[in-house]
Amino acid sequence: MMNKESFGACLLLTLPEDVFAVISRFLSPSDICNLILCGKSLPALVDTEKMWLVQCEEVKVLPLLEIVQWRIGISSYKALCRFLVEVVKPLLGIWVQQNPELGNVVYVMPGFLSVVGCRIIPQKVAPSWIQEDRVKWSPVFEIICGFDGSNGFFLHGRDKEGSCLYPGFVMGIEKSCNVLQLDVVPRQEKSSCNEIERGASREEGEIPFWMLAFSDRKNLLNIVTSHVSLHVVEPLNEMLFPTLKYDEAMLVERRTILLKMHKFGGNWKNMNLEEDDQLCYNPMQVKINEMLENLGDDYFFDEEELIEVTPTENTNVLGESSSSKNTTPSQSEIRVSNRQSFLSSGDTFGLGLTASYSEMSYYKGWPYMHFHHFLLYKLPVKKAVDQEAYAGLWGGTIGCPAGKCPKGKTEKSLYLLMLTYEESEEHSERVLIGTKILEGKRYVRHPNGTAMFVVKIDTPSLDPFPVDANETHFENSYSGEGIAEGYSFRYTGSKPGSLFVITNDLLAFVWKETKVVITLQRLNLTEILKKGLGSCVPPLPPSKNFTYMRRSFINEFTKLSTDSSYSE
């Protein structure tokens, strides 16, 4: 008698192909893999290009046209699905860091057979900026997809000679990741050229990178990046994603170059990807211990950076003293011991990117952060739904809707706000919070994470719009409070105001006393950047380009200090 498993397999085989294609949309990639293992006959039905194309669609990170375009540079839709599920989907979104206070927003989006991180630069924009799609940005990192669906990491940055790429390893990406960490990672050397290299496993008592003193971590990153750096010309540095300027052939050529760089380092021009892996020297790794014999232990001493340590580091590595003279011997010995333990954990060292999940606390949608770790934090930006119609990412400027305000300056500071819904702790009512994540001024009074306004979404406002709005229909208006005097992002003052809803994609908040207006439009940064009409700002040096560690209230993301786009 036929068992149940065999009967189920036979039943699937009798289904018409189009019917099974519909059913497959309700299956996950892991379900498909399990079906492949169920019997000898099922793989022919399930493990097909058509079936994996459906799975690529169901990941819902790329439109069908781009999925088909990406297939050109990869072995199969199955390999592509692996990259979309394991790399692209978990990383997409907005990542932030508190420092510098003016704005550190990294937007992660699909590239071309890659996922790319682009920093949105604090800037000034014209009133029609969203229609013209002109946004300044700078490259931060990218993860490229190999022919077999594998991945390779590049950090962007620059040195005195120009823009550079810094190849490294993807150490792991959790599906629900909310912390992105840049590390120096220990590696074990290959015993032979054909052996697969793996990261060094941590034994009990070994010190992880994040437990080192801040200055040690910074110096190790500087050592590694300076030795793996690969200089690139600006067009290669800018073509991170498809735009109107770059055709598919140019993107394919760029990806081929990146794959060569990741595999062969500085010798990539003379190598072919098809060549056998007989290169014993790994261009992504540095033998730090050999270098340190010549540098000496004083290389890691940085008196200025001893001040910048977190409370966690104080208890494990450093004291709170502000100079080396006040550092107790025991604390200094612990610091040296930790560093030596870390350096002994691998034969070579390279750059590593890890995306992990961590339990976090939030204040009005803004995560509490470690300021002196090389970390980016994912913002929980929600999509608009029926009961939360205004949730999501918004951008705007101080000023009335187009045509409603007196003529003034042609360019104004760009604000990016995350709108989220919460339950008010005081009155148990729903509120809409507009959290500022970027401000385009040269100097900022209130830092990242500041609530620009808090609106009682169930309380209508009877206040009039401050200028003639005869031609503008307001769907709704709600009472609330907007930021006033105060300091930090937790202790801001507030004054009464109202939120006016022009459409579901156009809002205006008005401070009642001053009549100041901030007009916001719903944003799709992917669409804006892919128009290619904005400008690419050169990146910072590598470690600063990932996370800028110093507290600063001025714009650190451009060297063009005379650029009017960054003035008050």
Swiss-Prot record:
Q: Please give the name of this protein.
A: Putative F-box protein At5g39480
All copies of the F-box domain together span 9-55
Please list the residue ranges that the record marks as compositionally biased, kind Low complexity: 321-332
Region of interest called Disordered, as start-end residue ranges on this chain: 315-337
- According to the record, the signal peptide region is none
InterPro entries xrefs: At5g39450-like (IPR040275), F-box-like_dom_sf (IPR036047), F-box_dom (IPR001810)
Q: What does UniProt give as GO cellular component?
A: plastid
Source organism (scientific name): Arabidopsis thaliana (Mouse-ear cress)
Recite the lineage of the species.
Eukaryota, Viridiplantae, Streptophyta, Embryophyta, Tracheophyta
What top-level branch of life does the organism fall under? Eukaryota
